[in-house]
Amino acid sequence: MRNYETLFILNPSLDEEATKAAIEKFKGVIEKEGGVVENVDEWGRRKLAYPINKVNEGYYTLINFKANPELPRELERVFRITDGVMRFMVVNPEK
């Protein structure tokens, strides 16, 4: 298993319950595919460097996890089809 981290930005118009549900959904995808979530760091609402779809703020969350090399592709697919995700990135911090 390799170490990965994902940082994603959720639309700030989501209420707190929807934000928590989205984070749990992504953690569930990682665990369902055989990964292990090591740390979830919610940075909260922050100003974006530039507007995305006329939105100036976003809800940032960082998840560190261990997984097989196939899992990041599935996680990215889920990010793309989930409403409310403005930006995301999955990286291997060792490289």
Curated annotation (Swiss-Prot):
UniProt keyword rRNA-binding present: yes
CDD domains: bS6
Pfam families: Ribosomal_S6
Presence of keyword DNA repair: no
Any one annotated GO CC term: ribonucleoprotein complex
GO molecular function terms noted in the UniProt entry: small ribosomal subunit rRNA binding; structural constituent of ribosome
Signal peptide: none
Free-text function comment from the UniProt entry: Binds together with bS18 to 16S ribosomal RNA.
Protein name per UniProt: Small ribosomal subunit protein bS6
Protein source organism: Clostridium novyi (strain NT)
Record gene name: rpsF
